[in-house]
Amino acid sequence: MSYGIFQEYYLTHQTLSGNYDLTGIIGMTSNGVMYLSMPLLFALFTKRWAKFRQTAMLSGTILACLSFLLSSFSTQVWHLVATQGVLACFGSALVFSPMTLSLGEWYKTDHRALAYGVTLSCKNIVGSVCPFLFSSLLGRYKFSSTVRIWALIIAGTSLFTIFLIPTHPSALPAAVSDLTEGANEGGDAGPPRSRKIPWPSLRHGTIYIYSIAIILQSAAYGIPQTYLNTYASEVALLSHTSAIILLTLFNIPGIASFSFFGYLSDNKHSTFSATTVACISAMSSGLSAILLWGLNTQGSLATLILFSITFGFFAGGYSAT
């Protein structure tokens, strides 16, 4: 969510060997690795490896921490691509995929989108704080120490929260699983729903239309995260502080928009269908990118602030639909 800070640092402090144009693909590669690996991970952890979800999340955390730690010893630009762009993000996917599946099983259908929205908004909370954190650490401790500190933060927060996620029933002893289901029969949450991979859905053309839309939206969402900070500094000639504020303003609206669009998708009394809500998010974010950034040849600060807030709100809420 805050890779633009590192991107600018790599370009202004060229201490590594290699082609520095490659640093621009790290942010996009990280998104691509996560999005492309998640369908396979979802399929594996839905049923076959459901009891290994916690193990996968712990392994993913360790992989992400080790990847950032290894990146602190990089001597070539491609080392950063391999560690930060590929390995660290695959570790993140190992955490995110089982967590997402568990979330969908322990919440009722009526509130699933809202639950996803609240959970996904956490990444925007982190993305709102990290630009200032990374900028301060890079200015004081330089690159190597910064990524090592970040690896420690990941380890401390992730290992603690992973154990708060309820264990999948297939990993519990039979007696405990029966007691859990019996206790939930009269409760609001209900027993965990058994999930199966809906293979017949692949015969419907609608799923491919949605897949293409998600791919395009996901690819576009990562561009401002990577290049907005550099654009503000090199094209708009804004100060370093202004560039950091733009990236923060890009992330802050997503904190509310995830929950908002999740609520609209869940609300059966709303006049908007789930498809309409997704279209509102996609079309509004697309128009803001064209009108507020694409046609903004002068790169004024006011217009870029408006773009960051508008695009961050509407594009951020797409995942919750």
Predicted regions and their residues:
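Helix-loop-helix hairpin linking two adjacent transmembrane segments in secondary transporters
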Residues: 112, 119-173
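C-terminal transmembrane helical hairpin of 12-TM major facilitator-type secondary transporters
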Residues: 251, 267, 271-321
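Intracellular juxtamembrane helix-capping segments at the cytosolic ends
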Residues: 6, 10, 85, 92-108, ...
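Hydrophobic core of transmembrane alpha-helices in multi-pass small-molecule transporters
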Residues: 64-68, 77-94, 102, 215-216, ...
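Extracytoplasmic gate region of multi-pass secondary transporters
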Residues: 3-10, 199-263, 270, 275, ...
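Juxtamembrane intracellular "pre-TM" segments in multi-pass secondary transporters
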Residues: 175-210
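Helix-to-loop junctions at the C-terminal end of transmembrane segments
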Residues: 37-52, 257-272, 292
